[in-house]
Amino acid sequence: MPLFRKLGFVNVKYNHGNKEFGKDVTFARRTEFDEYEYYGVQVKFGDVSGGANGDINELITQAKDAFSMPFYDVYSRNKVRISKVIIAISGKFTLNAVEKIIEGIQEYPLKNNLIFLDGEKIESLMSKYSRF
């Protein structure tokens, strides 16, 4: 979570539990239009493959929940909705996992607001921003 703060995000909050609706972590950034844009992060340990297992379906369901279920932002004291969902994993996205997740979300605008971070990308960002 310190990485998100170093990237300039604010209101970083850990939400893991049964009422997180696909958002293990939430945070925001102020846009160029002086409005807040909210992000949700679904965190998974290990690799995610495009094989016939429950990981893909679970991630699709959680991403849909993250977009559709508002959350209470304790900082603004308002119910808000996520604009972007980040799927962050400690391992790698293997085979066709990313494609299956994107295609599993039917709504076109939502597909364009998914961000995939694997362990290598996370390490690279941490290394780059740990200097600041």
Q: How should each PLM-predicted stretch be described?
A:
Residues 1-132:
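Mixed-charge (Asp/Glu-Lys/Arg
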